[in-house]
UniProtKB/Swiss-Prot annotation:
It is a multi-pass membrane protein. It comes from Coffea arabica (Arabian coffee). It holds the Pfam family Photo_RC. A quinone binds at residues 215, 264-265. Residues 345-353 form a propeptide. GO terms for cellular component: chloroplast thylakoid membrane; photosystem II. The record marks 190 as: Stabilizes free radical intermediate. The gene is psbA. It comes from the Eukaryota. This is Photosystem II protein D1.
Length: 353
């Protein structure tokens, strides 16, 4: 038998680069999506840290009343934030070279746009990188599909909502108290708590937490012991072992008796699909809800819908929410508007019955 060995031609520099980028042997997989992900996320992270520490106040409402957001200008970790780009800029693309000076760029909140646009591109590439690595390893693509939920949520609050409202100044500030401010104002202007898609998102997040805790506790309680009583049950697991590590029949039997038989999964694949799909679909719906409310298709309004035979209003919780919404709307951007839009109309809605 004769073996013929051909000398392999030396690869070009580009070929070696391609092999390195797509190699699954690297400690951290890079991938073609990673080529774009790494610089965009590094840029977003670097600018966020610098701006959170040292950015000067930003004229968010476009009325020459700058709002401070950085640590060096009097904030702490809780109150600090990257202040959104000024309403004077609106939806215009506002890179550094579009401003007359760096001071003007900072005053108009340029860092917010820079961070948000790089961040969204980066997390989208991270999702693509998850798909790419799954493809290289011969896995199914559902990890990237699951990650699409937080990507959709971030895109909704940082991009779709500002587009719908006409200005990046309406985007979510990048900070703790700024996030809560965004939520309160969103409720005041769009009545999000009464939107069915937000309700589905709440069910998804809280339901997902419940199901995760239930699943983890059931599995941990039905481990197949491979150790003595003097050793931890966790020590009996070997990474990559072919045998089941817990008894799904025991877990199914326990839960079936605790609730009822058909409340428990007897198929591990169906169970784990359900655990993944429940929160993901819920967050998808909330993202869709934010994206529709961006264009002022708001939550249900049942204000003063209950009246007696004489036409007098019987106040319900919907009317209480209406009063709260008006109060929150009065308080926000108090120097930019004399009245909230609801109160500035010729015929103001009656809230006293």
């Amino acid at each position: 038998m004769t073996a013929i060995l051909e000398r392999r031609e030396s690869e070009s520099l580009w070929g070696r680069f391609c092999n390195w980028i797509t190699s699954t042997e690297n400690r951290l997989y890079i991938g073609w999506f990673g080529v774009l992900m790494i610089p965009t996320l590094l840029t977003a992270t670097s600018v966020f840290i610098i701006a959170f520490i040292a950015a000067p106040p930003v004229d968010i409402d476009g009325i020459r009343e700058p709002v401070s957001g950085s640590l060096l200008y009097g904030n702490n970790i809780i109150s600090g934030a990257i202040i959104p780009t000024s309403a004077a800029i609106g939806l215009h693309f506002y890179p550094i070279w579009e401003a007359a000076s760096v001071d003007e760029w900072l005053y108009n909140g340029g860092p917010y746009e820079l961070i948000v646009l790089h961040f969204l591109l980066g997390v989208a590439c991270y999702m693509g990188r998850e798909w790419e690595l799954s493809f290289r390893l011969g896995m199914r693509p559902w990890i990237a599909v699951a990650y699409s939920a937080p990507v959709a949520a971030a895109t909704a609050v940082f991009l779709i909502y500002p587009i719908g409202q006409g200005s990046f100044s309406d985007g979510m500030p990048l900070g703790i108290s700024g996030t809560f401010n965004f939520m309160i104002v969103f409720q005041a202007e769009h009545n999000i708590l009464m939107h069915p898609f937000h309700m589905l998102g709440v069910a998804g997040v809280f339901g997902g937490s419940l199901f995760s805790a239930m699943h983890g506790s059931l599995v941990t309680s039905s481990l197949i012991r491979e150790t003595t009583e003097n050793e931890s049950a966790n020590a009996g697991y070997r990474f990559g072992q072919e045998e089941e590590t817990y008894n799904i029949v025991a877990a199914h039997g326990y839960f079936g008796r605790l609730i009822f038989q058909y409340a428990s999964f007897n198929n591990s694949r169906s169970l784990h699909f359900f655990l993944a799909a429940w929160p993901v679909v819920g967050i998808w719906f909330t993202s869709l809800g934010i994206s529709t409310m961006a264009f002022n298709l708001n939550g249900f309004n049942f204000n003063q819908s209950v009246v007696d035979s004489q036409g007098r209003v019987i106040n319900t919780w919907a009317d209480i929410i209406n009063r709260a919404n008006l109060g929150m709307e009065v308080m926000h951007e108090r120097n930019a508007h004399n009245f909230p839009l609801d109160l500035a109309a010729i015929d103001a809605p009656s809230v006293n019955g």
